[in-house]
Amino acid sequence: MTTRLQPALLLVLWGSLSLMELQAQRDVGSAARPDFLLVASFDNGVQNAVGGYHNKLERAPTVSVTARVADVVRGRSGRSLKVSVDRKAGGFGGVWITFYNLKQKESPYLDVRDYAYLSFWVRGARGGEQLTVKLADASWVPRDDALPVGPLSLFLPKGVTTEWQEVLVPLSGVKLNLEAMAGLTLDFDVVGRHTVYVDDVGFKQTASVVTPLTQHIDEPVRKREYDRAMWDWNILSHISDASRMTDFLTFCKTENIKTLWMQVSLENSALLPEGVRGAVKEVTGALRNKAEWKSFIAAAHRVGVRVEALDGFPEYAVKQNHNIPLAVVDAVIDYNGESRPEERFDGIHLDNEPYLLIGWRDWTIREQILRDFLELNQEAQRRVRQHSHMVYGVDIPFWWQHRDQQTGEFNGVVDYNGSRQPASFHLIDMLDNVGVMNYRNTVDGADGMLEHGQDLLQYADKRKRAKLFMGMETSSFPPATVWFVAGLPRKEFEERLKGEAADLAFRSRVNGFRTQIFDDGTNLHVGIELPPTPTPEEQTKIGATMAEIAEKLGASGHPAVKSRAWDVLNYVLPRIASDPEWKSPRARSITNPADRSQHAGFEAVSIMLPKITFAGTSHPELRAEMKMAEEEFSRYQSYAGLAIHYYETYRAKVEE
């Protein structure tokens, strides 16, 4: 089981059942209840027949993988759920299946009073696999757990074999509320490698009721290979060294990379912001490395690879800095105008990530940032269409159209062009293509790439505008120490961003240091990432930067909160200690090097969650996930391909 996730757009995958049908099924009187109530056949997407979801269950060092597969099924058609667990001591792994829509705020639980058995079918890859069956009612949901009802061997006396067997779990002796059943968990609690296939989960009135077989489902049309895109940030050796260029393009051809998003820069790049520079009134300049680009692009075109100019920075989203990215757009257009057709860029792609700006945490400022961001992209698209034959696109996160847990509002909602909707939908309406940073280390499940990408693809199919690339992450960053100032309550934080700290609202870096914000539910704490081994000069700069943040956005710099600064600190420490993205928190006094004044603060180590990257996935497992993603996403007309972030880490994974 799991706690409820952020509410999302409630769309049933592949149109299998409408929400009205799901509710009607639940409201049917007991006399009309079918002998067999199907919960999950795994045939049609991630959401099941009663509105629930499934997802892998894991805690490091255990690794779990789930996939809906068509090669091992009950009967002649359909899908089953393949569950693979490498169970290690100290972790846990398996799969959970909910009987309610955990993405709907007030979703009803499942009433199974009229049923005597939970039923599901299982077969092993080798036989002998061991696991424990757990069930949960509504009371177990807040505990993020389920009640063990017995090892699988209790219900299968001969154990798991390589043939399909039905598991029947009697409900009469289970001490749960059968009027409000929440889910099923299969917990692989024996150390070792296990792979089983699960199918046709449901409830039966009697043990003799036959579980129907899947008759037919519409499978996606499978292709031998699918087009892909790839980000490339460190481009110099690829465009300037002939042998490396050949090697790079050979790799692209082998991996079916048809579109490259490659970092460009201008001759006068000193004018570009280091992270905190204010508005730059005039930014003009020619593209750097023109001769190298001409040679490289011509070579790429000869092997069927498109090249798009890539640039981006969070501060570019803000209106006062639009002249910088627009200068890049103009420079690429000018370069194309003076180049032969085979030497021209095929497009321009911006990766700005405006949600990294400090002001994003204030809803009013967030909407301003998003309006500015949309205005930038609309103008960039206009220039590209008016002055070239290129395409224009931008990267977005997958979660702007998900709802905030506290407000119920879309995370990226904004009024623009007479419509109030998520910025992701606005961008799909106006641009040639969109790269969705759909960063998860699994395709399947409630928290997988398919679930997070399908509402955007459905919208794009309906609107028939932008093509969508589904991004996948293969990089990982090492743990980074972050120093925080003891922060302010949300109201005071937002007031300061509009007042004394207004100059920080539109920054993602302060004095060159990348910022991080930790929200403990009551207070917002701003910090900076430290270099791995700061020099004495950097240490002085760190102290001055922390003092600046403390005076503007810290408890010790706010007259009304200053006396409670250490209380704020005591409140945040246990909360950041329980957050999986952080470890080793401890209090730290911040000293201003200018006047030696002290500010309350703390430090913690930032961790990249394994679930957002395939960096820890083996190459064969990565191939399987990519194949699954491409087959599932290809159902959508707007799907343009997977987009791989980024070249060096993906190549290292391929060559493991």
Model-flagged regions — what are they?
Residues 262, 266-313, 361-394, 450:
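Aromatic-lined substrate-binding rim segments of carbohydrate-active enzymes
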Residues 233, 306-317, 373-419, 465-477:
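Aromatic-lined carbohydrate-recognition surfaces of secreted/lumenal glycan-active proteins
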Residues 438-445, 459-656:
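Substrate-binding cleft of secreted/luminal carbohydrate-active enzymes
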Residues 26-218:
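Beta-rich carbohydrate-recognition modules and glycan-binding surfaces
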Residues 243-268, 343-344, 433:
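Catalytic domains of carbohydrate-active enzymes, especially glycoside hydrolases
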Residues 40-44, 209-252, 263, 645:
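Boundary/entry segment of secreted carbohydrate-active catalytic domains
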Residues 261-266, 332-369:
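Active-site groove signature of glycoside hydrolases
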Residues 345-346, 352-356, 415-449:
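Aromatic- and acid-rich polysaccharide-binding/catalytic face
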